[in-house]
Amino acid sequence: MSKAFKLTSKFKPSGDQPQAIEKLVAGLEDGLAYQTLLGVTGSGKTFTIANAIEKVQRPTLILEPNKTLAAQFYAEMREFFPENAVEYFVSYYDYYQPEAYVPSSDTYIEKDASINDHIEQMRLSATKAITERHDTIIIATVSAIYGLGDPDSYLKMLLHLTRGDQIDQRKILQRLAELQYTRNDLELRRATYRVNGDIIDIYPADSEREAVRVELFDDEVENLSYFDPLTGEMLRRVPRITVYPKTHYVTPREKLLSTLDQIKIELKERLSQLEKANKLVERQRLEQRTKFDMEMILELGYCSGIENYSRYLSGRNEGEPPPTLIDYLPKDALLIIDESHVTIPQLGGMYRGDRARKETLVEYGFRLPSALDNRPLRFDEFEKLAPQTIFISATPGPYEEKQSDQVVELLVRPTGLIDPEIEVRPVATQVDDLLSEIKKRAAQNERVLVTTLTKRMAEDLTEYFTEHNVRVRYLHSDIDTVERVEIIRDLRLGVFDVLVGINLLREGLDIPEVSLVAILDADKEGFLRSERSLIQTMGRAARNVHGKAILYADRITDSMKRAMEEAERRRIAQSAYNEKHHITPKSIQKAVTEIIEGARTYTERGRFVNQAQLIAEEEAKYIAMTPKQLAKELRKLEEQMYHHARNLEFEEAAAVRDKIQHIRKGLLEVKE
């Protein structure tokens, strides 16, 4: 039931966007393996990519460096492609403590995790969409390179039912048990089913709001329909349905049995090695733990930590890459790596940390050596598996520069804004000079960002400015994501005029009201004063028509020189375009509510409505909770919802459901 990708937007490509779209599409059609979209802040990189996807009509995986940016990109893509499958694939752990052993203190730390039920459903929905539909866009984090169930085993386990099928009810229930669904005749929850005479109701694990009703008559499927699991309202009849497993780690019975045989062989070899090395405690520990896991797999089809046996479950040889989300992609898929200067190093760094932890577990008899193959992809493996790729960055890293067959520039903004003017001023008078600049900007109702090199200096500067009647706040690393969003909102609203921080490169700081960025000690070479960091930081003033960047330095370093030359090159290109097309630059107008616009619920009519007013008083309470407290609170609300449903109080149940949806969606955009 795939449709064509159809972009919905009131805007048309403008500025550099039309030529960038054309070049990217031509590059993809010519078979270029790697391209880079070098786009300045505010140039419409997301819109450009959305247009390219529509033109090439290919399923797309978009990798983001963190959950916050993934949620922002997901929200934008859903608005651009309302008729297509836009999915979200990030880590489903609210809290995660990996299994580990500390030999120095003989401390074993058991794996402990709190799984976010809603994100688990979204992950299952993503793999279902990419399996069934060509018109799919998945927005993911680095979670995409971690081991997932083998796609072949996963797809073999699907339960297909068609109207008119001859099938025994017991056979359907047996298949549901194999998919790890549990029977619950009292209340229907995700990944459960209930039986009432010849009617089987199934709540699919990948579904957010729809359950399936299978009506049998004398071992024949008489009717198939979708219904609302809360109200019982019948939504539509269908000729066929497919039920997907509860988890990506389901495996056909015959493969489970062969897996157990292989585990037995490896266990025997490893026990012999440990005995020869006189590691008797480790030998006993490994034998006990592995035999318990084998018993669980034999009886239930899974065990806690079954992913540690993924080498056998997926039928791979020692050292071969594990199956990941990338294995689920079709052959003609497209890969887009956003903020590639951050995401690429992240992808390269995941393997080593995971390996070191697991080697200790293997050495001390907590796991079999095959557990080492339950791991994220190495970067060289990722490169081999990756389809045609587009990197997106305002400051591409050395890897992108080396790999790219084509660099497509997006320098001109649709608003006509040019990159901020840059000035270098001496360090000796930096504080007093900055104070006078701040007062000028505050008088014009504009905002200032100040970046320092140390926490101490940021604190002293904030104190000094406060003494001089400047309304200032300090953004430090101890501030959580939610408070950070509130600080940014207050800055935009004019509650204060100056924001001081150390690392202002993180997301969410593209604020149109900021007309001055001050970089103190700009001549101290290092991570936060590198060419890329300087370009990114100066770009924070690029959304205001009076944008300016002041670098306080006693000498011009190589990084400063390169950053200033690049900024000047961009300014010249932008000014020339404006002159040619008679464009007068305008500051970006952006409603303040947008920055925290996560309080939205997707209604049955398929459109977003803002629900912030409904539970505004309670939102702060939920946001302030720890992941464990939040999971407990959501479970309590779900119990309340099912209680109403059992008592046939459907309106109350639907209200609680909407409240749960609101909390989840609201937190999705502010979580990291």
From Swiss-Prot:
Q: Which GO terms describe its biological process?
A: nucleotide-excision repair; SOS response
Location of the Helicase ATP-binding domain? 26-181
Q: Please name the Pfam families in this protein's record.
A: Helicase_C (PF00271), ResIII (PF04851), UVR (PF02151), UvrB (PF12344), UvrB_inter (PF17757)
Domain comment from the record reads as follows:
The beta-hairpin motif is involved in DNA binding.
Q: Can you state the subunit structure given in the record?
A: Forms a heterotetramer with UvrA during the search for lesions. Interacts with UvrC in an incision complex.
UniProt xrefs under PANTHER family: UVRABC SYSTEM PROTEIN B
Spell out the protein name for this chain: UvrABC system protein B
Q: From what organism does this protein derive?
A: Coxiella burnetii (strain RSA 331 / Henzerling II)
